[in-house]
Amino acid sequence: MQLQVMNSPFNQEQAELLNRLLPTLTESQKIWLSGYLSAQSVSAQEAAGTPAAAVSAEAPAPAVSKEVTVLYGSQTGNAQGLAENAGKQLEQSGFQVTVSSMSDFKPNQLKKVTNLLIVVSTHGEGEPPDNALSFHEFLHGRRAPKLEDLRFSVLALGDSSYEFFCQTGKEFDQRLEELGGKRISPRVDCDLDYDEPAAEWLEGVLKGLNEAGGGSAAPAPAAASQTGESSYSRTNPFRAEVLENLNLNGRGSNKETRHVELSLEGSGLTYEPGDSLGVYPENDPELVELLLKEMNWDPEEIVTLNKQGDVRPLKEALISHYEITVLTKPLLEQAAQLTGNDELRELLAPGNEENVKAYIEGRDLLDLVRDYGPFSVSAQEFVSILRKMPARLYSIASSLSANPDEVHLTIGAVRYDAHGRERKGVCSILCAERLQPGDTLPVYVQHNQNFKLPKDPETPIIMVGPGTGVAPFRSFMQEREETGAEGKAWMFFGDQHFVTDFLYQTEWQNWLKDGVLTKMDVAFSRDTEEKVYVQHRMLEHSAELFEWLQEGAAVYICGDEKHMAHDVHNTLLEIIEKEGNMSREEAEAYLADMQQQKRYQRDVY
């Protein structure tokens, strides 16, 4: 709708300006602007001496505010951050909002909820995050109530390079509908680059709620003051200077593990033990050169990166902005549509899912253009189908109390051969081969409330962290040493060889000597004829370990999810079953209760 001068208080120039501006605004921006103008109007009336009551007496009565419950299931903190942001924006729009982790929400309260927003990630092979497990199980069980009076919407987070993309969100969405719920707005599935789709989802939610008469069209006036403040974040990373970059493994090791120390001086960034650091890496320039050569593209050609119109030379864009080392089914589908390649279309034909899965595994963009190209498309067309470079999350290996203005990382270099070529981890090999002291890395802190030391410093802790999984426990120990925590601490560490792969060995020995660490058990799998892993050491001490659990100890696991964390989980169940004289079902309930009490926490990948 065009604003006309004849039916408005604006002159011709003002009307033209507004007609150019309004179509470019999103729904949430319009809502914010409405609240801002309302606040300005009230302020002007008060400054002129007009009582606020007189102003409100002439205004129409605001719509009755309705309650909205926002539940999140989050493993690394992304879903939690989006849920909290949604809560703030809803409050500014006049809603009464409760934001909660699914693990803290009492399922028997669900029947009382009128408007429900679900923000949830998918973990591992299509599984819910740890703090969503109990709610997911309840909702899919026999005790789930009928929800005919519920209105809901789901924001699903995932990674399209995995087979079960956004599976948990899809399951919540389907189940809530089966129980009688009606959608406020359609489910939105987000890939790694989730900012824009998440914002569009929230716009749809606000529109749906407001159309139902649930909230005011304007946010609270306080929103008007929330401008001009900027902090370093995932969308505005801080360039941290590299202070140290050392190889932790000894000569002759099969592994290369980097200890990287970064300066946070001047950033204002803070973190707690258990948090992660997001790092935006760059692609290997050699791989980019091969890709440019294969496609016969001009490296200096200017390409547009985003809807905002930011531009870069093609080579720079491929190095720093786009993901080129991972193939996904959506990427293949877009490439087939863009290029019209018959062979690629044949690969993607219905019923050919297993072949697609096999092709994607271990291949990158260079493989795609070599196998099915070169494509007769422009560089701009091709980069438009690529995902933005995702950040890599690393468990922080330091305590801010012990290392002011610094953050330390423990990064395992990834190298392997596949499909006739050497493959390299994007971020890990940047750190191993190209990153020097004095260089900078774009970083941000990812807070993780699902992996935190006990509030009571006297609570015993049991830590299981083989390989680079040791990182957060170095942070835990530094923090406990700084604060003088007196609770018992037991560490299980494992790797290949004692001589070359005992990461931070001297530090662990000093903590043992000083009493900061009570016990440490290690497993070096290649030093014995029969491979020994951390779960074997746990079984050897099953009676004492169960005693610690009975005393209220908190258990922390960090590292590989697919094998190690799965095996350790089953070992814990075995120990509880054996030492507690329980059935398997009782042991599972015991561990689930620990998880509910935040005494069983995992940082797995």
Curated annotation (Swiss-Prot):
The protein's enzyme class: oxidoreductase
Residues that bind NADP(+): 495, 525-533
Induction: Up-regulated by sulfate and the transcriptional regulator CysL.
Binding site for FMN: 74-78, 121-126, 154-185
Keyword Flavoprotein: yes
Protein EC: 1.8.1.2
Domain spans labelled FAD-binding FR-type: 235-454
Cofactor comment text: Binds 1 FAD per subunit.
UniProt-recorded name of the protein: Sulfite reductase [NADPH] flavoprotein alpha-component
Name of the gene encoding the protein in the UniProt record: cysJ
